[in-house]
């Protein structure tokens, strides 16, 4: 696709891709070293003064549960505003932005993904951090205790694909410990890894701590020591092609506000 497409042309070209992944909030409710930014707005005051708008937020798959909660809270605090989410692996989100999919806000699970579309975004703001754990079946039937147990070839291990942030972090920590794992599959996002473990299709997998927490009735989480772990950072930014620039900036600012941070931290995310 030509890089000289007009904004309208870029939006038309990407509309079908985004539409297939959009998750209307109404149906759901009734490490890196990027500096903290503003996402295109100052964090003080802009969220409360936000104009009503229909916002489309492209968000990393690991934010699925918490963002549904956050979106409902934001809509309640901002009557007339509707927040619609499209959840996917960060690499898919970046592809959507590059292809001109119509959206207002982008939130990825690493800063490197955000950097790939820096020409299309405002200044990112780190809104949360996360860490990896080993997810196992309920009761940890295979007695997985630490990372080196994942090298057992009798164990069915599933990992996120190396193209996605969770896969990059997984490779980083396994390589650092000189542990060789032969996964039975590599999944397109971290939620797919979690699903494999939940369904018993895998004995163990590396997922974010918050993902394991969201499925604690179906999986156990084996903690990984900080010295062996990686810190995932979540940058949020407005998209320059947004037709709701002021409202988009206000939403990003709200994610860093006390109310937004409480929702994120209650779900197990760490302070930025």
Regions inferred by a protein language model and the residue ranges of each:
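Signal peptide-proximal N-terminal region
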Residues: 75-84
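Pocket-flanking alpha-helical
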Residues: 91-122
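Conserved strand-loop elements at the edges of beta-sheets that form or border functional pockets
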Residues: 87
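Exported/periplasmic ABC-transporter solute-binding proteins
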Residues: 2-7, 11, 16-63, 68-72, ...
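Short, high-confidence coil segments that cap the C-terminus of an alpha-helix
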Residues: 80, 102-103, 202
